[in-house]
C-alpha cells in the first residue's frame, strides 16, 4: 500500500499500510451513557461533539466499539485470564490467520485488504447472510465502502469460528461494529 502526494508538479510515494486505533469520549463531559454518573451535557453539545467525526472519516474506520467504564471494585480484583482462556483465544487467532494464509496462498494479504472486486472470490456469503446484509444496507443507509467493510470483518469473524462461509451471525456481529453511539 502506498499513498501518492502531489505538490508543485512533483509526486511523492510513501508507504501507507497502518492500523489506526483511536479513542474518544461519548460527549464533552465524558459521561453520556454512563451507568453511574449522569451526563451534564445538553443534547446539542453532544451532537456537536459527535459531529467532529465526519461521516466520510467514520466510513473509513472498519470497527467502532463502545467501551463502558470499568467499576473500581472490578479494577482492584485484577483477575487476569486463566491459561486455558488465553490458550483458546490464541488458538482461535492462529487458526484464523492460517485460514487467511491458505485463502491467499501464503501471501501477506489479509481479509481487511480485500478489494471489492475480490469479495465474491474470497468471501462467500450464505444466501441468508446476503439477505441480511442487503436489508441492513438499506435500513442503515450503508455506503458502498461500509458495505464491503462489513463483509471483510464478517470474513474474519467466520475465520475465527473456523467457518468457510460467512453466515448470518457473522454479518450480524460485523454490523454491530459499524454502529456508533449517537444521542
Predicted regions and their residues:
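Basic, amphipathic alpha-helical bundle interface domains used for macromolecular binding and assembly
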Residues: 1-183
Amino acid at each position: 500500500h502506498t499513498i501518492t502526494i502531489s505538490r508543485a508538479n512533483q509526486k511523492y510515494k510513501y508507504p501507507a499500510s497502518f492500523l489506526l486505533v483511536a479513542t474518544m469520549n461519548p460527549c464533552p463531559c465524558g459521561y453520556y451513557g454512563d451507568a453511574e454518573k449522569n451526563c451534564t451535557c445538553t443534547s446539542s453539545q453532544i451532537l456537536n461533539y459527535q459531529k467532529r467525526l465526519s461521516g466520510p472519516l467514520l466510513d473509513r474506520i472498519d470497527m467502532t466499539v463502545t467501551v463502558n467504564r470499568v467499576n473500581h471494585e472490578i479494577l482492584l480484583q485484577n483477575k487476569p485470564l486463566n491459561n486455558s482462556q488465553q490458550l483458546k483465544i490464541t488458538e482461535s487467532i492462529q487458526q484464523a490467520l492460517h485460514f487467511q494464509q491458505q485463502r491467499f496462498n501464503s501471501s501477506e494479504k489479509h481479509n481487511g485488504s480485500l478489494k471489492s472486486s475480490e469479495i465474491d472470490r474470497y468471501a462467500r456469503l450464505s444466501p441468508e447472510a446476503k439477505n441480511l446484509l442487503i436489508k441492513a444496507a438499506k435500513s442503515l443507509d450503508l455506503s458502498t465502502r461500509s458495505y464491503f467493510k462489513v463483509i471483510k470483518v464478517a470474513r474474519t469473524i467466520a475465520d475465527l469460528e473456523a467457518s468457510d462461509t460467512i453466515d448470518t451471525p457473522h454479518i450480524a456481529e460485523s454490523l454491530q461494529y459499524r454502529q456508533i453511539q449517537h444521542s
